[in-house]
Design a protein with these regions (language model features):
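Phosphate-binding site recognition
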Residues: 1-221
């Protein structure tokens, strides 16, 4: 499923603004933020790093390795300030810096958010930059990140009913009403629904079978 047009437009608008911008991009499980980021970055200069659940030291090491690999540079220090000072777009175009699952590093290492704040204020990278802190943790996005970067949150919403109708354009509306009532408008769930199969077959295959893609999903949200 392609990213929602409205979500792409919001990011594109931020990208077009002059100066540096920062957005905390978040949404529930299945919101497909990775797909949105991939589509948005198409044709742009960007640096992407996905954080892991790791110790502060290991996280720092892994991001440094990615910086060195992508930009072919030798880092004199292992600090986030040093890392953000070495990124580059290679031209006048705005650079997009994406730190995915940022809560994993922000919660364990205060120097990361301090470096992000300096990056936004032009104290590390001289060129224009759009910083995207992406996360699947709604709590972190709306509390901790929101406290430091007030007003920067961008929530990825589920599809509304009309958008789901457009997604299943080959199905009768009555059938789509049943689908929407069962799994809502979560993009990842809708992608798993086989429009060629009956409603009953899909529910049995996805929801009721222990090996189904959506089995137990309600408990995991």
């Amino acid at each position: 499923m392609k990213a929602k047009h409205t979500d792409l437009e919001k990011l594109e608008q931020l990208y077009k603004e002059s100066g540096n911008q920062l957005v905390v991009l978040y949404g529930r499980r299945g919101c497909q933020k990775e797909e949105l980021i991939k589509e948005f970055c198409d044709g742009k200069k960007f640096f992407y790093y996905r954080c892991r659940q790791a110790s502060p030291e290991h996280q720092l090491e892994m991001m440094g390795e990615e910086i060195s690999r992508q930009y072919k540079v030798s880092l004199s220090r292992q600090t986030y300030e040093e890392y953000f000072a070495r990124i580059k777009s290679g031209g006048p175009s705005k650079l997009v810096v994406i730190i995915d699952e940022a809560q994993f590093v922000a919660k364990r290492d205060t120097s990361f958010m301090e470096a992000v704040a300096k990056l936004k204020k032009h104290k590390l990278y001289p060129g224009p930059v759009l910083i995207i802190l992406a996360t699947s943790s709604t709590v972190w996005a709306t509390q901790e990140a929101a406290e430091q970067f007030k007003g920067a949150e961008m929530k990825l919403e589920s599809l509304n009913f009309l958008e789901v109708v457009r997604h299943f354009e080959s199905l009768p509306v009555a059938e789509i009403v049943r689908i929407y009532g069962a799994i809502g408008g979560v993009p990842a769930y809708l992608d798993k629904w086989d429009a060629a199969k009956s409603f009953k077959d899909n529910i049995c295959r996805l929801v009721l079978t222990p090996s189904g893609a959506l089995y137990g999903e309600a408990d995991a949200v």
